[in-house]
Amino acid sequence: MVVPVKNEQDNVEPLVREIATALSGNTTFEIIYVDDGSTDATQARLQALKAEFPMLRVIRHRTSCGQSRAVTTGVTAARHEWITTLDGDGQNDPADIPALLAELANPAQPDNLELLAGWRARRNDTFLRRLSSKIANGVRSRMLKDNTPDTGCGLKLFARETFLQLPNFDHMHRFLPALVMRNGGAVVSVPVHHRARERGTSKYGVHNRLWVGIVDLFGVAWLQRRVRLPVIEVDSDR
């Protein structure tokens, strides 16, 4: 479980407790919080929780490097084959994690399944944020053909080895489905709950994501055009 956070002091304790409750008894797990240069009490509150939650590991960036780099730091440090991520603001529901794990174990899934992407079918956000996200997802899906209705959802389950093979750049977490498919992996979307933010303030706005998102979109499209996946024919004599 990798959780990137920045200045989420009021969300740390309730979310850690929810994650531990959701995963207790289901599987062996660790919770890795990556503090991306917080300037509030986030780090202190995480450290205070380690005595109660021995599975909690805390990594800190001295200065903020962005959400994608925080996720990469956590995935690199992880000790398990499969990684779950969720946002540290409390809007993703940890109770959905067992459902993702169940889908991973479903024998009907494709053999090359590498990513299960959460899909916030009913978002608890402002109208402007929902509208901008719907437009962005539509444009991205049309350009990248990633067949994923919601790439911005922080709740994902993916293979650690696959993630570490992907091109790494700022905001790459929003393009994981396209990048995984570029490497030949299958992606499956799973409906998940989305909750209203109860504490703290969002680090993202419509305007500070727009132009960066456009540049990144064309960059990922360029990467896709540079890859041709072979169709392997089995030698009938062997």
Q: Model features per residue range: what roles?
A:
Residues 5-8, 153, 213:
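Hydrophobic transmembrane-helix microenvironments that flank and shape a buried ionizable site
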Residues 1-126, 161, 165, 178-182, ...:
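Structured catalytic core of nucleotide-sugar glycosyltransferases
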Residues 101, 108-157, 161-164, 215-219:
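Short, flexible, basic/aromatic active-site loop/helix in glycosyltransferases
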Residues 138, 145, 169-238:
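Hydrophobic helical membrane-anchoring modules
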